[in-house]
Amino acid sequence: MSTAAPQENSPELKLSPSSKLNGFEWWRRTLSYQTGLGLNAEEKAQYEFDYNNRNLAEKCQQCNEYRNWMLEYSPSVLFMMDHIKKLTKDKEPILTKENITCDVCDFTKGGGFHPDEGILLCANWIRNKWQLEDILTHELVHVYDYLKFNLDMNNLRHHACTEIRASMLSGECRIWQEIKKTGLGNFGKKFQDCIKRRAVLSVSSNPICKSPEEAEKVVSTVWNSCFNDTRPFERVYR
């Protein structure tokens, strides 16, 4: 169970020289990336690769600080942690700060959850505190579903349902974020389209899924029941 990062990087890319990773030149590249001005596809891919592979120790430290802040102050994270604690009852807690781990990832994911290992937050894919909040909330929904519904990731319907719920409840598909990515067109369906897109992408990566077409079919099959299930929240509020 994992949260997809924005883009895949070419395996042929290598880290740029240090002169391009610091100071004015890095500021200039960042501005070009953010505005899209004077940036071709190759330069965009190189910037993303450099961003995700520079200052890794610093990014892990920052990720830990963000995680600690969220575990102390984030309404959505605290709410999910409380409901997960209720499901574990008197058993050994499934989650603590010690097994919500920040690390460098060599795959294009923002995070992941494994029942035996806890939650992984990919420090080199996390750009700011609020993205970490979305990713952590997403993974906490997976933890909740695992405890509440006996989630089986070898069942594609289970996988599709928890991905629909996690993208819906985490805030990753906020309307304003989708407008920034895709413009104002098809405004009324942006939220649903984002959730479906992310769910299909995740299910497609499941080893037992045969094709993207199968992933789309499974997501469509469970859509109505899972999209309308906001537990443990009363409604979608992020």
From Swiss-Prot:
Subcellular location: Mitochondrion inner membrane
Lineage: Eukaryota, Fungi, Dikarya, Ascomycota, Saccharomycotina
Record's protein name: Mitochondrial inner membrane protease ATP23
Organism: Candida albicans (strain SC5314 / ATCC MYA-2876) (Yeast)
Residues holding a divalent metal cation: 138, 142
A Pfam match: Peptidase_M76
Chief location category: mitochondrion
Keyword Zinc listed: no
Similarity section: Belongs to the peptidase M76 family.
Example GO biological process: mitochondrial protein processing
Alphabetical list of PROSITE patterns matching this protein: ZINC_PROTEASE
